[in-house]
């Protein structure tokens, strides 16, 4: 990797796994996925800190982001998810399980985790309805069931949509914010 660089390595890997024609499309998708995760990992979107003793840190709460920032991030993830779907339809059948494991699940689970928590933040402030957050939670569970069923259950229990039953991975409680965004 050091010799060729991360971008070339990723492009070559995508080409090897899914074909060079798809690598060109998937490279920017994966780069943007990693960029968004670098800003805030999906598991940190609930603004919780499990290691802390004080229970206040275990409660899902707002991020210090503006409504504009939240909506832009949701839009960015929606665009990635859309491309992931478009590529999956075109892939040959023998590549689809690997694609689900290596591209679709990571990108779309991150998308849905962001949707779940960011739409919950907007809903707490009356800027959207709770259904969007709840639907995202259900989508994460569905994606995870599909992942675990790959290859006749080869990877069963490999992924858990609620690891360690942490609050950030649960359905977000429908609450109203008392302070403005």
Features from the language model and the residues they span:
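Substrate-binding groove of N-acetylhexosamine-processing glycoside hydrolases
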Residues: 1-181
């Amino acid at each position: 990797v050091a010799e060729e660089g991360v971008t070339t390595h990723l492009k070559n890997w995508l080409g090897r796994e899914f074909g060079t024609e798809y690598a060109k499309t998937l490279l920017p998708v994966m780069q943007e996925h990693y960029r968004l995760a670098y800003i805030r990992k999906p598991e940190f979107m609930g603004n919780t800190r499990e290691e802390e003793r004080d229970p206040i840190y275990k409660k899902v709460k707002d991020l210090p982001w503006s409504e504009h920032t939240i909506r832009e991030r949701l839009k960015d993830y929606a665009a990635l998810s859309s491309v992931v779907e478009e590529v999956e339809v075109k892939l040959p059948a023998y590549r689809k399980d690997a694609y689900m494991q290596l591209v679709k699940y990571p990108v779309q689970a991150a998308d849905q985790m962001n949707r779940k928590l960011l739409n919950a933040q907007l809903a707490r402030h009356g800027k959207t309805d709770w259904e969007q957050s709840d639907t995202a939670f259900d989508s994460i569970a569905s994606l995870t069931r599909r992942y675990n069923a790959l290859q006749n259950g080869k990877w069963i229990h490999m992924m858990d949509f609620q690891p360690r039953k942490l609050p950030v991975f649960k359905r977000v409680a429908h609450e109203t914010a008392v302070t403005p965004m």
